[in-house]
Curated annotation (Swiss-Prot):
Protein name: Ribose-5-phosphate isomerase A
Keyword rRNA processing: no
Gene from which this protein is expressed: rpiA
GO molecular function: ribose-5-phosphate isomerase activity
Enzymatic reactions: aldehydo-D-ribose 5-phosphate = D-ribulose 5-phosphate
Keyword entries, A-Z: Isomerase
Coiled coil: none
Binding site for substrate: S31, G32, S33, T34, D87, G88, A89, D90, K100, G101, G102, G103, K127
Active site per the UniProt annotation: E109
Amino acid sequence: MKEDPYLEVKRHLAREAAALVTSGMLLGLGSGSTSREFIKAVAERKKQENLDIRAVASSKESYSLASSLGIPLIDDEEFINTDLAVDGADEIDPQLRMIKGGGGAIFREKILLQSSQRRLILADESKSVKVLGKFGLPVEISPFGRSSIIATLENFGYLGNLRKNPRGGFFITNNGNYIYDIHTPNVYPHPEEDLLKLLQIHGIIEAGFVIENVEVWLGYTNGQIGKKNTGGL
């Protein structure tokens, strides 16, 4: 497996974010490589300082990692609010609009962000872009009417492919849905408009644009962390 050139940046971001955690908190755990480092950093703090914390995970992978490291997890159907949600991003533009969902957990990730008192996105400098779209746009779609949904997407000009798993079958999300990765268009100067258009198509569960009130911490290889906030909560 190719070594991640930004692994140390992600670990630095994760440690700094884990320092925000205090006893009594309910955490929202995102998915992806940066979120994995945050989970590890939180588990280390819990072990060293005996923190009384609980968490909700956005994916089976994050759930398994947190559980294996001793972080108690609550029923993911019963939580109302979390104190702090921490996640990563695939692309972030200058207005802090972003694309997420490369790991296929965008639906759950957005619910955790929505429910949290504090929403923190951690990303290395490679995720900063002038215009969203180069990464591609993941869209979670219903298995029922799959071909019809895809035809509607194509009629709107959104061309892509159903994501495959390593065994060659269709990738299935934790909610039992498919991921349709849009590769055309590949630039989104006005992602709010595209998000609205996509969510009006019946059968689309969620789209990978994140346009929320969030904090963004951008980590650099020189050790610095740039901190920005879109306002709001």
